[in-house]
Regions:
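Alpha-helical transmembrane segments and their helix-start/interface "positive-inside/aromatic belt" motifs
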Residues: 14-32
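Membrane-helix interface/capping segments
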Residues: 79-99
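Membrane-helix boundary/juxtamembrane motif in polytopic membrane proteins
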Residues: 95-113, 169-176
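Alpha-helical transmembrane segments and their membrane-interface junctions
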Residues: 115-135
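Alpha-helical transmembrane segments and their immediate juxtamembrane interface regions
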Residues: 139-170
Length: 176
């Protein structure tokens, strides 16, 4: 009976390690795909700079530079969040789930995503002033900013949950 229990325990540990490995791979893949999208958007922004000749030269250049700066800020913040996430998954795979270090990691992820949302929202406002005729693009930008803020809010809530669980676990360890 005891051997069966040990086999199940080892199988579940292998399954957990596989899940953590898959999470790290997925995060790295998201980083690569995100970088490719950022480079593609950057190329579009640079090519739009060359279109800035004629009547709307200042508007086109301002819109292109706004887009390039926004893509750079969002890319840096998302990479920071991904790196923090990958490190946190490493700690989780070692069995340390409810720690203050993981709480700080979730808070850092939330902060990075909130900065990304704020950058997109600032770009939305600037582009609204510059390019009034791009209504559909503006709606997409607003929805993207809201998505970043929503995920940042969830990450912040999880950081608070992990903080409380870490305190409870520490108190429980001290009691034992």
């Amino acid at each position: 009976m005891e051997k069966t229990g040990n086999r199940k325990k080892h199988a579940s540990l292998r399954d957990e390690q596989a899940i953590f490995r898959l999470l790290r791979i997925a995060a790295a893949a998201a980083g690569v795909i995100g970088t490719l999208i950022a480079v593609w958007l950057g190329c579009i922004g640079v090519s739009c700079l060359s279109w800035g000749i004629g009547d709307r030269m200042a508007d086109t250049i301002a819109a292109s530079l706004t887009g390039l700066v926004t893509v750079a800020i969002v890319s840096i913040c998302c990479w920071r969040a991904l790196i923090v996430f990958i490190r946190m998954v490493g700690r989780l795979s070692q069995g340390s789930a409810f720690t203050l270090e993981n709480e700080r990691a979730m808070a850092a992820i939330a902060f990075s995503l909130a900065i990304s949302g704020a950058a997109i929202l600032a770009a939305f406002v600037l582009l609204l002033l510059i390019c009034r005729e791009m209504v559909l693009t503006m709606i997409y930008l607003l929805l993207l900013a809201l998505a970043f803020f929503g995920v940042a809010l969830l990450a912040h809530a999880l950081s608070l949950l992990v903080r409380r669980a870490a305190v409870l676990q520490r108190d429980s360890d001290l009691t034992i």
